[in-house]
């Protein structure tokens, strides 16, 4: 079974959407294998977003993810990475289709509620960062 990292970002926590987002994941046949609410340190944020370090929005990403608690989840299921990516919808909520988490619930950038790993390599790296091992 494939595993992936899903983060419910601070805007989702503040808006009390944790249960709704988990319900949508489980309704797609995915299982939550690990879950924790945490504050992301600057160091963890910078490592998590390392691929964007040279981009102009890097600082904004780090500030946003460290500004409030997040819910980190190890999610498992058949084709979990693709299932999660489709369920999340487009990165920009204005472009996300109805029926997706961002299309139905997100307000605007950067408040797009969730993060999901984009490849098996990213999933392995991100799960190690957030859950160890």
From Swiss-Prot:
PROSITE patterns: NDPK (PS00469), NDPK_LIKE (PS51374)
Active site residues of this protein: 115
Locations listed in the record: Cytoplasm
Keyword annotations of the record: ATP-binding, Cytoplasm, Kinase, Magnesium, Metal-binding, Nucleotide metabolism, Nucleotide-binding, Phosphoprotein, Transferase
GO molecular function ontology, one term from the record: metal ion binding
Pfam families: NDK
CC cofactor: Mg(2+)
EC number(s) from the headed UniProt entry: 2.7.4.6
Top-level class of the enzyme under EC nomenclature: transferase
SS bond list: none
Domain of life the protein comes from: Bacteria
Residues annotated to bind ATP: 9, 57, 85, 91, 102, 112
GO biological process, alphabetically ordered: CTP biosynthetic process; GTP biosynthetic process; UTP biosynthetic process
Entry annotated with the keyword Transmembrane helix: no
Reaction(s) catalysed by this chain's protein: a 2'-deoxyribonucleoside 5'-diphosphate + ATP = a 2'-deoxyribonucleoside 5'-triphosphate + ADP; a ribonucleoside 5'-diphosphate + ATP = a ribonucleoside 5'-triphosphate + ADP
GO CC annotations on file: cytoplasm
Subunit structure: Homotetramer.
PANTHER family recorded: NUCLEOSIDE DIPHOSPHATE KINASE
Family from the record: Belongs to the NDK family.
Function: Major role in the synthesis of nucleoside triphosphates other than ATP. The ATP gamma phosphate is transferred to the NDP beta phosphate via a ping-pong mechanism, using a phosphorylated active-site intermediate.
Protein name in UniProt: Nucleoside diphosphate kinase
Lineage of the species this protein comes from: Bacteria, Bacillati, Actinomycetota, Rubrobacteria, Rubrobacterales
């Amino acid at each position: 079974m494939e595993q992936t990292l899903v983060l419910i970002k601070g805007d989702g926590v503040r808006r009390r959407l944790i249960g709704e987002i988990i319900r949508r994941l489980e309704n797609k046949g995915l299982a939550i294998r690990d879950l924790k609410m945490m504050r992301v340190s600057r160091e963890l944020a910078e490592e998590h977003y390392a691929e964007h370090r040279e981009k102009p929005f890097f600082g904004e990403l780090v500030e946003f993810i460290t500004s409030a608690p997040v819910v980190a989840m190890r999610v498992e299921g058949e084709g979990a990475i693709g299932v999660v990516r489709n369920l999340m919808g487009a990165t920009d909520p204005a472009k996300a289709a109805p029926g997706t988490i961002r299309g139905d619930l997100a307000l605007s950038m950067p408040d797009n509620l969730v993060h999901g790993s984009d490849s098996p390599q990213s999933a392995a790296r991100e799960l190690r960062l957030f859950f160890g091992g």
